[in-house]
Amino acid sequence: MSNTVGQIIKCRAAVAWEAGKPLVIEEVEVAPPQAGEVRLKILFTSLCHTDVYFWEAKGQTPLFPRIFGHEAGGIVESVGEGVTHLKPGDHALPVFTGECGECPHCKSEESNMCDLLRINTDRGVMLNDNKSRFSIKGQPVHHFVGTSTFSEYTVVHAGCVAKINPDAPLDKVCILSCGICTGLGATINVAKPKPGSSVAIFGLGAVGLAAAEGARISGASRIIGVDLVSSRFELAKKFGVNEFVNPKEHDKPVQQVIAEMTNGGVDRAVECTGSIQAMISAFECVHDGWGVAVLVGVPSKDDAFKTHPMNFLNERTLKGTFYGNYKPRTDLPNVVEKYMKGELELEKFITHTVPFSEINKAFDYMLKGESIRCIIKMEE
């Protein structure tokens, strides 16, 4: 790869030219990394619901043409000036949020919300010069959340790149770049269930299943899945879920159903849907005195919810989390090691694999609700 250092690389990328239209495989030019940046050769990427959301232009600022993708694994091709923690040949995971290492958030043991590199879905350019590193015949193509992994090569801020064990299979650990860590960490790092405890998981999509996996790893004995789609329950058993509640099948609030099932409430609840009603239910279903509810799902812009202050005064705790409270550069390598040691199971999240030329199939699988994670293999 060294003969490309400092040069423009021509490669294939899946370009979204307009909202909701199939991606088109195009030849793009990828500029070399500037100071503080890294150019990665992407080997495997996967589709996350966030990609679909912004591809459908439901986000704040639709930007097209754009190269989506933010869950991926690859190899460092070259680094820009001042980058010291990475070198060509390193195996790495790009992440939609970063760790500059210098801001108050990065210096705090409690936060992963870097001031400089926190997720920005509206920005389609690099921080350095407010320009794109992608172009087609001279026309700039927008970046997406600083990663744009639906390209054989991409340029990412060095603070958003985690160096990982080179023995880790990139076609498996690539899914740790977003959704799996978001759910897993919400349980392990934020809810912190004790062995033998009870945990309710609201929403059994990819993030909710990852939250359930976190409860399984933590040793929870009762893992209650809550979802409006009963067909999801069978699959969820693979992730440690051993009891199920469909709110539509009851004539009382689901928090009351769960409280009755658990002699007053669960020890922990993790909400992974973004639904206001689910947030209220998750908080109100935890036991007084010690119960902790964690919000993961992203609500709509103008949403608000109310609950009685006595729920707090009775010693219930409500927390929020972002990317599972993991610092990307510091913590992600350790999550990869959890997988390498057999503590974390990733294979069960991967339901489909497609070649890069058939990337639109991944969108079809997700839109039909058929996939948890679809791996897109860049080299064919």
Swiss-Prot record:
CDD domains: alcohol_DH_plants. InterPro entries: ADH-like_C (IPR013149), ADH-like_N (IPR013154), ADH_Zn_CS (IPR002328), GroES-like_sf (IPR011032), NAD(P)-bd_dom_sf (IPR036291). It is found in: Cytoplasm. NAD(+) binds at residues 50, 203-208, 227, 232, 273, 296-298, 373. One of its GO terms (molecular function) is S-(hydroxymethyl)glutathione dehydrogenase [NAD(P)+] activity. Keywords: Cytoplasm, Metal-binding, NAD, Oxidoreductase, Zinc. Its EC number is 1.1.1.1. Zn(2+) 1 binds at residues 48, 50, 70, 178. It is an enzyme of class 1 (oxidoreductase). Binds 2 Zn(2+) ions per subunit. It catalyses: a primary alcohol + NAD(+) = an aldehyde + NADH + H(+); a secondary alcohol + NAD(+) = a ketone + NADH + H(+). An alcohol binds at residues 50, 70. The keyword Metal-binding applies. The keyword Calcium does not apply. Pfam families: ADH_N (PF08240), ADH_zinc_N (PF00107). Homodimer. PANTHER family: ALCOHOL DEHYDROGENASE, ALCOHOL DEHYDROGENASE CLASS-P. This is Alcohol dehydrogenase 1.
